[in-house]
Regions:
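Membrane-embedded beta-strands of outer-membrane beta-barrel proteins
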Residues: 33, 64, 95, 123-125, ...
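Outer-membrane beta-barrel "beta-signal"
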Residues: 166, 171, 201-215
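Detector for outer-membrane/organellar transmembrane beta-barrel domains
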Residues: 89-150
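Residues that define the transmembrane beta-barrel architecture of outer-membrane proteins
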Residues: 6, 27-31, 58-62, 89-93, ...
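Residue-level signature of outer-membrane beta-barrel architecture
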Residues: 37-39, 68, 99, 113, ...
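Transmembrane beta-barrel strands of outer-membrane/channel proteins
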Residues: 14, 46-50, 78-82, 109-113, ...
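Outer-membrane beta-barrel initiation region
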Residues: 1-56, 60, 68, 189, ...
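Repeated loop/turn-to-beta-strand initiation elements of outer-membrane beta-barrel proteins
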Residues: 40-46, 72-76, 103-107, 132-137, ...
Length: 215
């Protein structure tokens, strides 16, 4: 059967340039990619996202996961996650699910557990609204929450950040699409307090321009 054969794919959902609207927000480059190898039922999955500022990797998140199909539209995933930022690097054991929710919302959610009782919950949801067969509007929401304060990395217990954005892309083909958009990010709770103490913005708005492609 075809489902028993191994396949692979690499997708860059976001490869973009982002520019802040206020004078205290600089421009950055951002990426969000995923690669997998395996069958329809079992596969190795690598997820990578990050941000570059002044030609330097400012922060990154990399996950190496094993995925198992729970149903036609949902995969269960387990593996390791590695975070790096201005503070100490963090390592996690990650459990998650990824798939299509009712009404065709793309959902990627995970719970990660680290040393010293650290935990983090992440939720990302996207939806594609077809204006035409090639012009697509994509709202996106990302939520992060932590189980305890991590002062060295500037994140606090509870709801840490909420990002909402909308991107309009034009698909020259199913494999290549440039886009424009805008994104709003807010920090909350202790994370907002840590940001203010460090002289960083708690709310920010950015215009984004990039490409989405896969092979």
């Amino acid at each position: 059967m075809a489902d028993e054969h191994a396949f692979w794919a690499v997708t860059f959902d976001r490869l973009e340039y982002a520019d802040g609207l206020s004078s205290n927000l600089g421009s950055v480059s951002q990426y969000d990619a995923q690669a997998w190898y395996g069958t329809s039922y079992e596969r190795l999955v690598i997820k990578a996202e990050g941000e570059l500022a002044d030609n330097t990797l400012a922060e990154s998140e990399t996950q190496i996961l094993w995925g198992h199909a729970l149903s036609t539209f949902w995969d269960r995933q387990i593996g390791l996650r590695f975070d790096s930022s201005e503070g100490p690097s963090r390592q996690w054991l990650t459990f998650g699910v990824q798939g299509l929710a009712p009404y065709w919302f793309e959902v990627d959610t995970s719970l990660s557990v680290g040393p010293e009782g650290r935990t983090v919950f992440n939720l990302e949801a996207e939806y594609e609204l077809l204006i035409t067969q090639r012009l697509i509007l994509q709202p996106r929401v990302v939520v992060s929450a932590f189980g305890k304060d991590d002062t060295k990395n500037g994140v606090g217990k509870g709801l840490s950040s909420l990002t909402t954005g909308i991107r309009l892309r034009y698909e020259f083909s199913r494999k290549f699409a440039p886009y424009l958009g805008v994104e709003w990010t807010g920090k909350y709770g202790n994370t907002a307090d840590f940001a203010q103490l460090a002289g960083q913005p708690v709310r920010q708005t950015q215009w984004v321009a990039g490409i989405r492609f896969w092979f």
